[in-house]
Amino acid sequence: MSNILEVKDVVKQDGDYTALNSVSLQVPKGSIYGLLGPNGAGKTSLIRIINQITMPDSGEVILDGEKLAPNHVSVIGYMPEERGLYKTMKVGEQALYLAQLKGMSKADAQKQLKYWFEKFEIEGWWNKKIQELSKGMAQKIQFIVTILHQPKLLILDEPFSGFDPVNANLIKDEIIELNKKGTSVIFSTHRMESVEEMCDYIALIHKSNKLIEGKLEDVKRQ
């Protein structure tokens, strides 16, 4: 099986602190890949490098056979743990703006937004400001914006924090459905039960190092 993502010997220093210590990963195409570890282990540092928010001090990242480059922003969907929506902008206006940053035309973005707003039964939110929404409502908008441009690789950092159980299950179902249609998923969490429920591959990150990587059932046997 070919890989959607390869991380090769990535090192990231933050002053005297080593955030990532020569970390290598292989994420198979079409997988749901769990990045498991406690808070502060280095998971978010790695995700920020994959998303080109920060650069590694050494090592490289290969996306779908190509060295990671600025144009790859259009094929990655990233939902950070700290959600980044502008609180005073209207929901619809903001969603259109973020979709166009990912390379979508306004017409395509409007069509996709109509589909997702109807699917999530939130058509009435279009003209609301983000600050008027509950945390769970804002999470739904962030998820829609993350997947709107139909990315090849979906990266979710603690995606269920802030959701009640009903909406968490709704988002889980959508992630699984997107994966069935061919989207590769990296799912970062500190919760083993979430990984066991959704993932077929896993890497355990601890104290800036990768401890283990492989198929979920193989890792559980070790």
What are these regions (language model features)?
Residues 217-221:
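Short acidic-hydrophobic catalytic motif
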Residues 1-3:
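Primarily ABC-family ATPase nucleotide-binding module
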Residues 5, 12-23, 27-206, 211-212:
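ABC transporter nucleotide-binding domains
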